[in-house]
Structures are given as C-alpha cells and as structure tokens.
C-alpha cells in the first residue's frame, strides 16, 4: 500500500471514530503546512491543547516527528505527539512522542 493510500485509510478510520462518538471531525482534526513546506499530517485540537500526529507506513520511522517543532513558535499547549505506524505495540519514541500501532485506531 502506498504512503498516500495508507494516510487516507488512517484518516478515514479516525473520522469514522469521531462520528461514532457523536463528534464532528472538522472541529478537531486539521492538517498543517507552513510557507517552508514543513507539514504535519494531523493536528488534533481539543480546546487549547494540540496533539501533533504523523502517519507513517513503516515501522518506527526515526524522522517522523522532525516537523513537530514548528509548532513551538505559536506558544500553544502542545500535548504528547503520536506517530501512527506499523509497530506492534505502544512505545515511546522520546519524552514527547509515542508510536501507536495502526490496529489500535
């Protein structure tokens, strides 16, 4: 499965999950890309807290969170980041980010 199809599948599953819980996804999920073309696949916004999410097809991609730091300039409350990938269990990437297996979404 190509990366674009994989991302579409994950986002579709997340959207279905929101609707299943009576929430409108467009109120919570956003895409980020700045003028330097740095992007983050999803931003989950809940009140004043933002959780950056990257979707990667491989297992434990090391550079998955390289663009999370672009959010620092906005001085917002940034929650623990997530990398949804093909790993087998939840595990930390670092102090601020966790790998989440795709089968848990």
Residue ranges, per PLM feature:
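A cross-kingdom feature that marks ATP-driven nucleic-acid transaction machinery
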Residues: 1-105
């Amino acid at each position: 499965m190509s990366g674009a199809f994989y991302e579409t599948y994950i986002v579709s599953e997340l959207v279905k999950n929101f609707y299943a819980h009576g929430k409108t996804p467009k109120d919570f999920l956003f895409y980020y890309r700045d003028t330097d073309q740095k992007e983050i696949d999803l931003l989950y916004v809940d009140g004043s807290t933002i959780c950056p999410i990257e979707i990667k097809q491989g297992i434990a991609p090391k550079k998955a969170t390289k663009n999370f730091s672009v959010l620092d300039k906005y001085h917002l409350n940034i929650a623990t980041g997530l990398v949804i990938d093909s790993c087998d269990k939840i595990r930390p990437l670092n102090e601020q980010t966790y790998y989440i297996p795709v089968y848990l979404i």
